[in-house]
């Protein structure tokens, strides 16, 4: 019982929604938990929003979007799964990014080098780019299913820490 009480308090679940209704409470949750699973798809709600709703009184989903996309104090990366992490912790992810990059070097990055250079050049020249902004290319075998080369390579560059998501 003592361990259960400790864990519930440690994870900011007791008392329910006790954190004040302000954007800083989102950062407090991330500081305590380290990361939040991020799933931009909505069935019952976005996963990170549901997690924050349980902890922050009067939580508004716009707070997380602003911290992530406008203020850039949060960052979208992989931490076992797609997660939101504080931007201040990015240096700790370099090891994972380097490993991901090594996995794509000699693979997708080399096999599709002209397209990688084209995408990076366009981003340098014009700024953020969506896979829908580029003429579709043939599909390649990707993690779960065949995927358009453009989308796959942009995803691989994000996994390798070369690119970041500007906005979903």
Which role fits each region the language model picked out?
Residues 1-168:
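Long, low-complexity intrinsically disordered regions
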């Amino acid at each position: 019982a003592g361990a259960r009480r400790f864990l519930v308090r440690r994870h900011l679940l007791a008392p329910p929604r006790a954190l004040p209704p302000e954007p800083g409470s989102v950062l407090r949750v991330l500081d305590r938990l380290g990361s939040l699973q991020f799933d931009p798809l909505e069935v019952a709600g976005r996963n990170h929003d549901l997690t924050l709703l349980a902890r922050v009184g009067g939580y508004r989903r716009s707070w997380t979007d602003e911290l992530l996309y406008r203020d850039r104090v949060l960052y979208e990366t992989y931490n076992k799964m797609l997660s939101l992490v504080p931007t201040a912790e990015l240096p700790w992810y370099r090891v994972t990014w380097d490993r991901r990059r090594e996995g794509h070097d000699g693979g997708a990055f080399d096999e599709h080098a002209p397209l990688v250079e084209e995408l990076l050049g366009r981003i340098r020249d014009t700024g953020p780019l969506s896979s829908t902004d580029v003429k579709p290319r043939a599909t390649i075998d990707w993690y779960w299913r065949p995927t358009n080369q453009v989308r796959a390579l942009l995803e691989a560059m994000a996994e390798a820490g070369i690119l970041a998501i500007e906005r979903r």
